[in-house]
């Protein structure tokens, strides 16, 4: 039986002891409890292989007389040794599929990435940008000016050969990226309303900040039709359908070698990449002030992480198509799901989960550090004042949110409490008058 699982009448149940507290939102799991070679940590095996590799480099390989190459290789080797330690020794998170070591690996990558960000934060602006040349010699140069926005006509009568050329120009690689991105984000958040709010809010942020970053300047139909309705909306819809299937699925697991047929074995291998159990997230932001503030905080951090993607490219001089940008997105896809589960557990069962999970803590620290790098490297761009009408819209929105918060969690509660006290007093007075009238009758 693996760590983080609890044995029930039919085998291990769920991913932790909190199952009994969330019986209505977590699926039942049936497992024969088979603990095979695949599930072991293999600490001694990894240590032996690591020692042999280091011994080979030390005793048999001649060290090159290239200081820059040796420095890079030494840093990479140090990171690999840390990853080997973390994958075998770090604490398991809430997920166990496809393998706990997979999620331990991404936890350790989070630590490495945060340390890298801290290093960049403590450099001068020029040194930090030039340091990127050690990762890729093509980096460290200012980005070329690009034309964004432009002609926003859906049908351009001036172009007789292709009047819909503006639409075709927008159908690039970012369209499937938006779709799959929001499909995966929906699997992380597991709530239609939160996904739609984040999607729409980010488009408003692009409108508000296009005077700072030119690539935020898009046509209205690109914002609301291409992004919100088609790409994001379709990704959220498919994500919700997948969530519905996962919540209805029966989680019944059997050891690979206990399955008699080859077809059954292949099916079991494929399903190894599906969740071990499933928890339906019920955020309930209006149920209490604590949950409302927590959900608002989650949305804020989510939007900040999205903005960091664009601002980091801008201040560190990375072109949008660079592989480091893609690697960062892959990183957040893998750590985001774990972080959201840890946050939900922390909110939903604070008596058992007394502290925020390790992956959620690291994701919050990474998001904050990325933003601090943006602030340090280009404060001028960040301090460009918003247009007056944009400022008015945001002030109005903030006032509406604060007003609703005050009404829902303070004024409404006070009013309901006053009505309840008044009702109790009236009932008490009625009972008292009834007793007096009965006494007069006798």
Curated annotation (Swiss-Prot):
Glycans are attached at residues 159, 215. Keywords: Endoplasmic reticulum, Glycoprotein, Lipid biosynthesis, Lipid metabolism, Membrane, Phospholipid biosynthesis, Phospholipid metabolism, Transferase, Transmembrane, Transmembrane helix. Pathway: Phospholipid metabolism; phosphatidylserine biosynthesis. Residues 1-40, 96-104, 313, 376-381 are cytoplasmic. GO terms for molecular function: L-serine-phosphatidylethanolamine phosphatidyltransferase activity. It comes from the Eukaryota. It is found in: Endoplasmic reticulum membrane. The chain crosses the membrane at residues 41-61, 75-95, 105-125, 292-312, 314-334, 355-375, 382-402. It is an enzyme of class 2 (transferase). The keyword Transferase applies. Its EC number is 2.7.8.29. Coiled coil: none annotated. Catalyzes a base-exchange reaction in which the polar head group of phosphatidylethanolamine (PE) or phosphatidylcholine (PC) is replaced by L-serine. Catalyzes the conversion of phosphatatidylethanolamine and does not act on phosphatidylcholine. Can utilize both phosphatidylethanolamine (PE) plasmalogen and diacyl PE as substrate and the latter is six times better utilized, indicating the importance of an ester linkage at the sn-1 position. Belongs to the phosphatidyl serine synthase family. This is Phosphatidylserine synthase 2. It comes from Gallus gallus.
């Amino acid at each position: 039986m693996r760590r983080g699982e609890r044995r029930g009448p039919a085998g291990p149940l769920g991913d932790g002891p909190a199952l009994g507290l969330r019986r209505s939102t977590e699926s039942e799991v049936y497992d024969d409890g088979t603990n095979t070679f695949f599930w072991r940590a293999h600490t001694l095996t990894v240590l032996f292989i690591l020692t042999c590799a280091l011994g080979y480099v030390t005793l048999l390989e001649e060290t090159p007389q290239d200081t820059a190459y040796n420095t890079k290789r030494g840093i990479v080797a140090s990171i690999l040794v840390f990853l080997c330690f973390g994958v075998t020794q770090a604490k398991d998170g809430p997920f166990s599929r496809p393998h706990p070591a997979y999620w331990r690996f991404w936890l350790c990558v989070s630590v490495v990435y945060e340390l890298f960000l801290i290093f960049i934060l403590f450099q001068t602006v020029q040194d930090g940008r030039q340091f990127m040349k050690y990762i890729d010699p093509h980096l460290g140069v200012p980005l070329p000016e690009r034309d964004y926005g432009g002609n926003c006509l859906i049908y351009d009568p001036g172009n007789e050969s292709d009047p819909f050329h503006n639409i075709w120009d927008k159908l690039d690689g970012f369209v499937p990226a938006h779709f799959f991105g929001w499909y995966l984000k929906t699997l992380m958040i597991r709530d239609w309303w939160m996904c739609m709010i984040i999607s729409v809010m980010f488009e408003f942020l692009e409108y508000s900040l296009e005077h700072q970053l030119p690539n935020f300047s898009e046509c209205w139909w690109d914002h609301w039709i291409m992004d919100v309705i088609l790409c994001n909306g379709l990704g959220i819809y498919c994500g919700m359908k997948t969530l519905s299937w996962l919540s209805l699925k029966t989680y019944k697991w059997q050891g690979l070698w206990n399955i008699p047929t080859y077809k059954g074995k292949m099916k079991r291998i494929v399903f190894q990449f599906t969740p071990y159990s499933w928890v339906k997230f019920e955020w309930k932001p209006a149920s209490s002030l604590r949950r409302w503030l927590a959900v608002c905080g989650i949305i804020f951090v989510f939007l900040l992480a999205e903005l960091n993607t664009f601002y980091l490219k801008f201040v560190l001089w990375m072109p949008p198509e660079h592989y480091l940008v893609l690697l960062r997105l892959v990183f957040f896809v893998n750590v985001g799901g774990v972080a959201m589960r840890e946050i939900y557990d922390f909110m939903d069962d604070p008596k058992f989960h007394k502290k925020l999970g390790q992956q959620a803590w690291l994701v919050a620290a990474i998001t904050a550090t990325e933003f601090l790098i943006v602030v340090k490297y280009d404060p001028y761009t960040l301090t460009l004042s918003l247009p007056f009408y944009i400022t008015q819209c945001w002030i109005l929105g903030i006032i509406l949110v604060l007003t609703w918060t005050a009404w829902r969690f303070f004024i409404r509660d006070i009013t309901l409490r006053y009505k309840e006290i008044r009702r109790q007093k009236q009932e008490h007075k009625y009972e008292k008058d009834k007793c007096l009238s009965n006494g007069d009758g006798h």
